[in-house]
Design a protein with these regions (language model features):
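Charged, amphipathic alpha-helical linker segments immediately N-terminal to NTP-binding catalytic cores
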Residues: 1-27
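Pre-Walker A adenine-sensing motif
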Residues: 29-42
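Conserved catalytic/switch belt of AAA+ P-loop NTPases
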Residues: 38-39, 120-144
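Walker A/P-loop nucleotide-binding motif
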Residues: 41-62
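AAA+/P-loop NTPase substrate/partner-engagement loops
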Residues: 52-57, 65-105, 111-116
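Conserved AAA+/SF3 P-loop NTPase catalytic/coupling segment centered on the Walker-B
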Residues: 101-130, 163-173, 188-189
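A short beta-strand-to-loop transition that corresponds to the Sensor-1 phosphate-sensing loop
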Residues: 108-111, 139-142, 151-162, 181-184
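Phosphate-sensing "switch" segment of ASCE/P-loop ATPases
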Residues: 137, 145-150, 166-253
Length: 253
């Protein structure tokens, strides 16, 4: 490892991201933090966060930037059978349930699940998993699944939560957190100026590739700085901060 400190590594990460995606640094910080949360010991509760935003708001770009991280488990479509199947022809390791441990399940287009015929089965399944509970099914071939809770996180993106989708996810309560990406507030002249500069700068694909590399390098640095993980010192917790966190928890429940 170089003599670069963790703070210097973080500063370089922010500086590079600010160069190419200056209006999405905070949201990217949150996504990387969710991916890096596995380094913190004694966390057993899964986290689920969804990005909301209009087309071209950057939600898909944010997920694409972190796509190459080793903890990302990317899925474009989900079915109840894909999560856990009773078919004897499908090995346990090929089923999503047995791939979740230590991963961030990432669903870039979550809204289509609302139109999935099996959605009413999938959502209760994930409610149980996000509760940190074991997951088993009783079938004609016996009991399948796992008796151990899966430690995983979940990310997704959608334009908005439709009434139909809200009906499905509403019972999941505080297990889900939503971040609304603000629209770019630019005048016509500012928009024209931004668009005309695109031809003289790196292409979107090039910027995305640079961002992916810097995020991966930063994530790998976290692993180097904390090879044994991070043990939370609860005795050093600030009471005021704990109270603020508790108030926020009440707010989102």
């Amino acid at each position: 490892m170089s003599d670069q400190t963790f703070k210097q590594s973080m500063d370089l990460f922010h500086k590079t991201i600010a160069k190419y995606f200056p209006d999405r640094i905070l949201e990217l910080d949150i996504l990387v933090a969710i991916c890096a949360s596995f380094f913190i010991r004694d966390i057993s509760q899964p986290m689920a966060l969804f990005l909301l935003g209009n087309p071209s708001s950057g939600k898909s770009t944010l997920l694409e930037i972190i796509k190459e991280l080793p903890v990302i488990l990317w899925r474009d479509n989900l079915t109840s059978a894909a999560l856990l199947s009773a078919s004897p022809n499908i090995a346990p390791e090929d089923q999503l349930l047995h791939q979740l441990e230590g991963k961030v399940l990432t669903i870039p287009e979550f809204a289509p699940l609302a139109n999935n015929a099996q959605a009413k089965q999938i959502m209760p399944d994930f409610t149980r998993l996000l509760d940190g509970n074991a997951f088993v099914r009783h079938t004609g071939n016996g009991v399948i699944g796992t008796t151990e809770a899966q430690r995983f996180n979940m990310l997704g993106a959608m334009v908005r939560v439709s009434p139909k989708l809200w009906e499905l996810v509403g019972n999941m309560g505080p297990r889900l957190v939503f971040i609304k990406l603000p629209d770019r507030q630019q005048s016509l002249d500012q928009t024209v100026t931004r668009l005309t500069k695109l031809s003289s700068k790196r292409s979107y694909t090039e910027k995305l590739e640079v961002a992916r590399k810097i995020v991966l390098a930063f994530y790998e640095n976290i692993a180097k700085y904390y090879p044994d993980g991070v043990t939370w010192n609860k005795e050093a917790d600030d009471k005021d901060t704990i109270q603020k966190i508790a108030k926020l928890a009440v707010l989102v429940t």
